[in-house]
């Protein structure tokens, strides 16, 4: 069964749709300048696909927490959990097929990177017999893959880069 996610209109006025099954079989990078509509496009994609596929959103700015109330995503406030607790939450989300929003708002860059890496690590370390299609969205992904350590420790950068690499 093909699930067409309506994203807008073509220049000719016809509906522009994305095949969800095709999207889940590959990777997608949404890139653009500030104000170009990246967040709007991601929200549309998430809202349209929510009934069809498990989702995990890594949300550094709290922009997607409203999906919890509207679509039933479990919102996890990373600030309230240890790295080990977030790893366990990632494992449980995968096993029980729960859509989640990992809210990283309020944490400094180091802790955002560490906690996102722990949660994603939990998702990926679960036995393969629990793997089902999942749409993973990392908003502001550049925050989790810095070219140099800068304001964060080398260890946090390494953990975060490892988690981002697992998504590829």
Q: Each predicted region: which residue ranges?
A:
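N-terminal pre-Walker A segment at the start of P-loop NTPase domains
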Residues: 1-16
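Pre-Walker A (P-loop) beta-loop-beta motif of ABC nucleotide-binding domains
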Residues: 24-25
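Switch/coupling segment of Walker-type NTPase motor domains
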Residues: 16-20, 29, 43-122, 150, ...
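Conserved P-loop NTPase motor cores
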Residues: 29-36, 46, 114-168
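Walker A/P-loop
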Residues: 39
């Amino acid at each position: 069964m093909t699930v067409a996610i309506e994203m807008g209109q073509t220049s000719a006025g016809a509906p522009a749709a994305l095949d969800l099954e095709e999207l889940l079989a590959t990777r997608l990078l949404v890139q653009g300048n500030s104000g170009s509509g990246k967040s709007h496009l991601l929200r549309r994609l998430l809202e349209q696909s929510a009934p069809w596929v498990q989702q995990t959103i890594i949300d550094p700015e709290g922009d997607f927490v409203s999906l919890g109330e509207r679509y039933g995503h479990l919102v996890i406030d990373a600030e309230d959990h240890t790295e080990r607790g977030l790893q366990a939450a990632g494992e449980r989300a995968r096993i029980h097929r729960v859509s989640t929003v990992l809210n990283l708002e309020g944490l400094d860059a180091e802790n955002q990177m560490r906690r996102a890496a722990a949660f994603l690590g939990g998702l990926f370390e679960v036995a393969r017999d629990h793997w089902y299609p999942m749409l993973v969205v990392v908003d502001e992904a550049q925050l989790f893959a810095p070219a140099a350590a800068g304001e964060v420790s080398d260890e946090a950068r390494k953990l975060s880069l490892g988690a981002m690499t697992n998504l590829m």
